[in-house]
Amino acid sequence: MTHTTPLLPLAPPINLVDLRYNELHNAITAFGEPPFRAKQIHEWLFSHHANSFAAMSSLPLRLREKLAERFTLQRPEVVEVQESCESGCLRPTRKILLKLSDGALIECVLIPAEERMTACLSSQAGCPMQCTFCATGTMGLQRNLSAGEIWEQLYALNGLALQEGKTITNVVFMGMGEPLLNTDNVLEAIATMSSRNYNLSLSQRKITISTVGIVPEIERLSRSGLKTKLAVSLHSARQEVRQQLMPIAAERYPLPLLSKSLEAYSKATGEAITIVYMMLNGVNDSKEDAHLLARYCRHFSCKINLIDYNPILTIRFGSVQESQKNEFQAYLMAQKFHVTVRKSYGASVNAACGQLVTQQQRRTIK
């Protein structure tokens, strides 16, 4: 009897947009092509936004054929655009739902202001951190996004901005996922969006990476030479309260350890860190909470950003009264901290801070 080895299924071709630049460079040189072709292809992908290999007209036909044999070229599909215009808004906040090449769904948000157009980008499909006030955490982690998929969000949002005669001026990594659990791809995307070779050419100082406090990666950023800004979701200077709100982040990186990394970051970069503090009624809004927050933040250069709780489906915290928030802010300012109260945009379409969760969680998209 003859036995045959079953054929293993072939791996699906790689989407060219998902390659990091060094991976693209290696693939091109493996084809026997000169290295400058990698730069040309990268510009076709991210500056000209080519949708096919045939469109890359400056490349030799033989190279385009090799690319088509080895790779696919798939762009995200815009599934839905929702708008929210709260009282007094000049322009609507807009949220885009994108479907990626493997079917994963992510959201990104365009936030307008008088002098700025801010793109709020996701770094992961879902999130593993399980913060109790955040809708994204209910999804769990599906996967990291590639640098190309991060860039595609910026491209899509800039298209909306261009409809109003504007362009993106600022980027915040405050969408779905924890950026510092996908640091390599986030940094690769930042390198592209801040490069002079590409259309937007954003200043790195206009880009903010927001984290729950992944200490080893904060230390990595402090050594990286990046000029981006850092925001840290703190939400309580009491370890036991922070563990209730952010169980994974607080347990892995307790407040004293996080403080040391922020102090080192501030000294290494000379930059003030933004401490993000979501005020929750009866949880972290007392005078003692304000006192502990001020004491905690004395160890590093920072500004404090107070934000309102935005309701999500799974857990109902209470919002803080305006008078209570004003007292909290006044105390911190009396302690010589720069304190701002962030205005929430997009709550009516679940686009505000902590509300991003793909529509797959609310209804099925066919």
From Swiss-Prot:
Principal subcellular localisation of the protein: cytoplasm
Single GO term (MF): tRNA binding
Binding site for S-adenosyl-L-methionine: G177, E178, S210, S233, L234, H235, N310
Catalytic activity: adenosine(2503) in 23S rRNA + 2 reduced [2Fe-2S]-[ferredoxin] + 2 S-adenosyl-L-methionine = 2-methyladenosine(2503) in 23S rRNA + 5'-deoxyadenosine + L-methionine + 2 oxidized [2Fe-2S]-[ferredoxin] + S-adenosyl-L-homocysteine; adenosine(37) in tRNA + 2 reduced [2Fe-2S]-[ferredoxin] + 2 S-adenosyl-L-methionine = 2-methyladenosine(37) in tRNA + 5'-deoxyadenosine + L-methionine + 2 oxidized [2Fe-2S]-[ferredoxin] + S-adenosyl-L-homocysteine
Subcellular location: Cytoplasm
GO biological process assignments: rRNA base methylation; tRNA methylation
Swiss-Prot/TrEMBL cofactor(s): [4Fe-4S] cluster
Record bears the keyword Cell inner membrane: no
Keywords: 4Fe-4S, Cytoplasm, Disulfide bond, Iron, Iron-sulfur, Metal-binding, Methyltransferase, rRNA processing, S-adenosyl-L-methionine, Transferase, tRNA processing
Catalytic residues of the enzyme: E107, C353
GO CC term (a single one): cytoplasm
Broad enzyme group: transferase
Entry's cofactor comment: Binds 1 [4Fe-4S] cluster. The cluster is coordinated with 3 cysteines and an exchangeable S-adenosyl-L-methionine.
Classification via InterPro entries: Aldolase_TIM (IPR013785), Methyltransferase_A (IPR040072), RlmN_N (IPR048641), RNA_MTrfase_RlmN (IPR027492), rRNA_lsu_MTrfase_RlmN/Cfr (IPR004383), rSAM (IPR007197)
Cysteine disulfide partners in this protein: C120-C353
Family matches, as Pfam families: Radical_SAM (PF04055), RlmN_N (PF21016)
EC number(s) stated in the UniProt entry for this protein: 2.1.1.192
Domain Radical SAM core: 113-342
Further facts: Reaction proceeds by a ping-pong mechanism involving intermediate methylation of a conserved cysteine residue.
Family annotation (NCBIfam families): rRNA_mod_RlmN
Protein function: Specifically methylates position 2 of adenine 2503 in 23S rRNA and position 2 of adenine 37 in tRNAs.
Protein name: Probable dual-specificity RNA methyltransferase RlmN
Provenance organism: Chlorobium chlorochromatii (strain CaD3)
Record gene name: rlmN
